[in-house]
Amino acid sequence: MAVISKVTYSLYDQKEINATDIIISHVKNDDDIGTVKDGRLGAMDGALCKTCGKTELECFGHWGKVSIYKTHIVKPEFISEIIRLLNHICIHCGLLRSREPYSDDINLKELSGHALRRLKDKILSKKKSCWNSECMQPYQKITFSKKKVCFVNKLDDINVPNSLIYQKLISIHEKFWPLLEIHQYPANLFYTDYFPIPPLIIRPAISFWIDSIPKETNELTYLLGMIVKNCNLNADEQVIQKAVIEYDDIKIISNNTSSINLSYITSGKNNMIRSYIVARRKDQTARSVIGPSTSITVNEVGMPAYIRNTLTEKIFVNAFTVDKVKQLLASNQVKFYFNKRLNQLTRIRQGKFIKNKIHLLPGDWVEVAVQEYTSIIFGRQPSLHRYNVIASSIRATEGDTIKISPGIANSQNADFDGDEEWMILEQNPKAVIEQSILMYPTTLLKHDIHGAPVYGSIQDEIVAAYSLFRIQDLCLDEVLNILGKYGRKFDPKGKCKFSGKDIYTYLIGEKINYPGLLKDGEIIANDVDSNFVVAMRHLSLAGLLSDHKSNVEGINFIIKSSYVFKRYLSIYGFGVTFKDLRPNSTFTNKLEAINVEKIELIKEAYAKYLNDVRDGKIVPLSKALEADYVESMLSNLTNLNIREIEEHMRQTLIDDPDNNLLKMAKAGYKVNPTELMYILGTYGQQRIDGEPAETRVLGRVLPYYLPDSKDPEGRGYILNSLTKGLTGSQYYFSMLVARSQSTDIVCETSRTGTLARKIIKKMEDMVVDGYGQVVIGNTLIKYAANYTKILGSVCKPVDLIYPDESMTWYLEISALWNKIKQGFVYSQKQKLAKKTLAPFNFLVFVKPTTEDNAIKVKDLYDMIHNVIDDVREKYFFTVSNIDFMEYIFLTHLNPSRIRITKETAITIFEKFYEKLNYTLGGGTPIGIISAQVLSEKFTQQALSSFHTTEKSGAVKQKLGFNEFNNLTNLSKNKTEIITLVSDDISKLQSVKINFEFVCLGELNPNITLRKETDRYVVDIIVNRLYIKRAEITELVVEYMIERFISFSVIVKEWGMETFIEDEDNIRFTVYLNFVEPEELNLSKFMMVLPGAANKGKISKFKIPISDYTGYDDFNQTKKLNKMTVELMNLKELGSFDLENVNVYPGVWNTYDIFGIEAAREYLCEAMLNTYGEGFDYLYQPCDLLASLLCASYEPESVNKFKFGAASTLKRATFGDNKALLNAALHKKSEPINDNSSCHFFSKVPNIGTGYYKYFIDLGLLMRMERKLSDKISSQKIKEMEETEDF
C-alpha cells in the first residue's frame, strides 16, 4: 500500500452519487433486493457481497441511490452555510448585496489577502434594498424554520422553495467565490436527482425498540427506509427534507436527542472513528484472572493450557522457515494454511484429505498453536501509563489463570484478589520484533521521569530482604541452600562463616559504590529496608546497578534476589499471628482506659463551656473556632494513642527482638503506628471531605444521641478500636465515610479519565528533535528536552548541597548559587528545594580514595569547567542555561567532601558524554510520556483522599485533581484566588477590613423593637468582644447599619444614635418610618436586618492572616504574613497601599499584567503544587504541559485547538463532530504528519522508531565495494612485492 502523504476533503457532487448502479426503489421485498438492506450494498453477517463477491473483511461496501424526482433537498449539516450565503445575495435578482454597484471585470485571484479583505468590507457592507436598478427590491432575511422544516422569509414567514435558493446559489459566478469564501460548486450543498444510500458496513443489524415493538435492524436502516418510502410516494419537498434531517442529524429540528442518526458516527463517546479506527476489537486475544508465580521471571508471563491451545501464531513461509513449516505439517501441528496465490485459507483437520492446495511458496503462511518464548503483549486496565502494557515471553504454566511475576505487580497496579488481565498475540513479524524490544520489561525497567526502577519486591519479599541481611553465622551449606540454583558460582574465598551481607555482595556482583550505602559492591548501611528492594525508590539496589552498568544487570538482580528471598522464606519461614500483634490484653486495656478517661475529660470541659455560655457567664466562640478547639482536643487524644503505640513498639523490640510484626515495621512493610492505632487504640474521627459529618434532622447525625447534642462521639469520633469492635452507631459512622468514598471513586475515575485523554491528545505530537529540543510540528516548545538533553529515565534527583565556607571553590560555588537560587526557593517563598536534577547518576561511579592518590584540586576544577563549557557550546549551542549541572558537579565532587582519583573523574565525564550522545534519540515521544505520567499520578491522587491547605474558615486552596482540572481548563471570567504576602501585617489588615464579609448577625446582637407615637425604634445592643473578635471597630458596625438603612427603599425617614451602654456593650438606636404598607415593610426590614447590614464582599469564607517563615535564601529566613482573597480582578486592590506587598494573582491576572511567559511559569508551579509533597520530579512534565498551553500569545485550554494547525482528523478523534464537515465544506488539504492522521491512514507516525527515514544509498555501496577491491588489490601487490624482495 502506497504511503499517503496528503489528504483533501470535499463534498460529494451529484455526479458521483448518480454514478452508482444500485438503485433502491422498494421499502420491502422478499429477498431485500432493491431495499435499503440490498445485498449489493456490501457483505454482512457472513453473506458474501453481491457486487464484488468478497467477505465482510475484504469488502468495504458499495453505495446505492434512491430517486428524489428532481426535488431539491438541502444537505442538513450545511443549512447554516446556505443561510450565510443568502445573507450576501439578493433573493430576487441573485446579485451580491452591495452599497454601490460593482463590475464583474475585477480579477480577485490577483488581489492580495489585504486588498481582498478591503473589497469584502466595501462590497458586502449592508444596505436596505438592492442596488440593481432592474430589481430595487428590499433585501429579504431568509431563515430556516424548524417547525415547517423549510427555508422561510423571516419578515412574513412565507416558504422559500429549495429550488429557488438552488438556482440563486449556482448562478453566483465563480470569480466571486473568494469574496464569499465559497470553496466549491454551491450545487454540492444540495441533493437533486438521487439521494445516496450508504453501504451496509456502517449500519450493522442490532436489536432495539420502536413504539414498544422490537426491531432487528439498525436505526439508520430504519430511517433510510423512511426516506425511500417518502421518495416512492413522491412526497412534498418538506416531507422528504424532514426525513433526511431525521436521518442526518435530528438536533437541527428537534431537542429529542435520544435517537441514533448519522451524526452519531462522528460525535459522542462511542463514535465510529473511536470504535473502529482509533481502537477496535482484535482477534487472537485472551482475558483471564491473574495469579502470582514463583517459577517465572520478570521478563516472562505464564499462560494456561486453554489459552495456549486457542491462540495461534503465524509463521510465514520463506527460505529460512520452509523446513520448519514442513516439520510442523508433518507432525500435525498446523491449524490453518493460507495460500497467497489462490487467496485461500484452508483449515487443516486430522484425517482430512487436502489436494493441490499446499504449495509452500514465499508469502504463504501457516497458523500453529502459540509456542513457548513467543513475545506476547499483556496488560491490566486501566492502562494509565506504559508500564501497564508490556510484552513478555510466554511460559507454559499449570492451572487456569494467567501468571505474572510478583515483581511487576506494582508497575501494573495489580493485586491477586481477582484482578483480570488481557493479552494479545500480534501477527505481524515487524510488530513482534518491535514489541519484543520496545515493550520488553528489561527496556522499561526505569521510570521515564522519576528514573527509579518500576519493578521490585512486594509483600513478604520485603521482610525476607530485611531478615536475610541481619542473619549471621551461616555455614557454606546454608548459604548455598539459600542461593539455590544461583549458588553454583558462589566463591567462599576461604571463609567458613558467612552473613546475610555476604549473600547480598554476591547477588550484587559488581564493584559498585554509592555514598553511605555501597562500597565496592558491599552494603555498608545498617539495615536493608524497603527502600533498597521495592519499586520506585531512588536507593533501589536494582536501580543503582542499572545506573552503573545497564538495565540487564538491574533486571537480573531483581530476578535473582526475588528467587533468593522466596527461598529464604520457604526455608526459615515467616508468619504473623494475632499474638504478635497483641500478646495479651494488658496494653489494649491500658489504652482503652486512657481513651475513656480522656474523652470524658474532653466532654466534661466542653459541657462546662456550653453551660457557661447558656448561663451568660462567658461570651461564646464563633462556630468555626469552637469546632477547631474541639477538633484539636480530639487530635491530641489521637496523637496520645500514637505516642503510646510507638513507645510500646520500642519496648517490645527490646523485650522480644524476634517479634515478626515489628520486623515488618522495621522493614518498612505494611505496619505503621497509625495503622496499629486503629487496631489497638482508637478508630478516630470519621471525616467526609475533611470535615466531621454534618448534623441533619433535629440537629443530630444519628438517632442514638439527643437532639442538638454536642457530644463528639455523636459527630463521628469512634472511641473503640477494631480489636474491641465497633458499636452500632460507630459502625454507621464508618459506613457513612465508606459510602462517600465509594461514590467519590466512581465519579473521580470518570473525570480523571476524561482529562487524561484530553491531555494525551493535546501532547501526543510533542517529540524530541535531532537537536535534543522539544517540538510540536514545526513549533519549538523547549530548547532542551528534560533540561539535560538526556533521557528522563537516566536523569537522577540528587541532594542539593548549599554553599558552605568549608567547601573548596566556595566563592565560585556561591556565585553560581546566586545565579540559580531563584528556582530553588518556590511556592511563595514557603519552600526550599532539597533535591535537584543531575544529568545522570554519577554517584555510582564515585570511588573514594586517599589524599595521596587524589586528583589535584585545580585539575579537577579545570576538568569540570572545561567539560561544562564544551557541553554548553557543542550540545546546548549556548542557548540553554546549564549552570545547574556545573553546580552539581562542583558540590558533589568537592574535595572537601570526597577525594577521587583522576581516573574516576575521567570515567564520570566520559559517562556524561556517553549519556549526552546516546540516550535521548530524535523522535522520543516526550509529550505522550509526560501526559501519561501526569495522568497516572493525578488519577491515583483523586482516588485517594482529598487534601487542602487552610484549616480555618478561609478560602480553601483546593489541591489535588480538582485544582489541576481547573488550571488546565483555564476558564475565564471566574474569581481567582489572590495571595498577598508581606512582612508588614497592617497593610494586609486594611485589605482584610475592606474585603472580609461581616454581617450584623455574626456579632450576636440583641435586637429589640418598640413603637412610639410617630415612629418605630430599633435598639441593637452588641457586645464589644464580638466586634473585637471580628477584627473591626464600633465605627465600622455603625457604618454597616447606616449604609443598609440609607439604601433601603422601604424606609421613608430614619435617624440613628450610638450609646455606650456599659464597659462591655454598645447600643445603636435607630428611629424609623416606613413607606406603605407600613406593617409589611417593618416585618421585611426586621427579617433581613441581621444579614443585610454588612460590609465586605459577600462570601462564605473569612480572610484570616496567617504567618509563616519565608526563605530569601537557604540560610536567610524572615517572618511573613499571608492572606488569600477571592477577587474577579486586581483592579479591586488599586485603592490600597500595597508597597512592599507581594501579590500572587491567578493565571488570567498574571497573563493580563505580565504576559504569556509569566502565565507559563505560574501554570507550571500551580500544576505541580496540586500534587502535594514528594512529587517534585513532576516539574518537567508540568513545565512541558504549561509550555504547550502557553505556546501562542494567549493561554489555551486543553479542551481546544484554537492555536496551531490541528489537523481535521485530530479534531475529529478528539471529539469535534463538526471537524470533518467543515473540512469538506472548505475543501481543506492537509499533510498527514500528526499521530491521529497517521493512525487513520496506516502511516508510521513521526515519533519513536518512525522519526527517522531509513534508506540505502546503493551508489555508496558500489563505491565502497570499488574502494575495498582497490585496497585489497593494492595490498596483494604489496604482499607480492615483499615476497619477491625476500
From Swiss-Prot:
Keywords from the UniProt entry: DNA-directed RNA polymerase, Nucleotidyltransferase, Transcription, Transferase, Virion
Lineage: Viruses, Varidnaviria, Bamfordvirae, Nucleocytoviricota, Pokkesviricetes
Compartments it resides in: Virion
Function text: Part of the DNA-dependent RNA polymerase which catalyzes the transcription of viral DNA into RNA using the four ribonucleoside triphosphates as substrates. Responsible for the transcription of early, intermediate and late genes. DNA-dependent RNA polymerase associates with the early transcription factor (ETF), itself composed of OPG118 and OPG133, thereby allowing the early genes transcription. Late transcription, and probably also intermediate transcription, require newly synthesized RNA polymerase.
EC identifiers of the protein: 2.7.7.6
Top-tier EC class: transferase
Gene Ontology CC terms, in alphabetical order: DNA-directed RNA polymerase complex; virion component
Name of this protein: DNA-directed RNA polymerase 147 kDa polypeptide
UniProt organism field: Vaccinia virus (strain Copenhagen)
Keyword Lipoprotein: no
Source taxon at top rank: Viruses
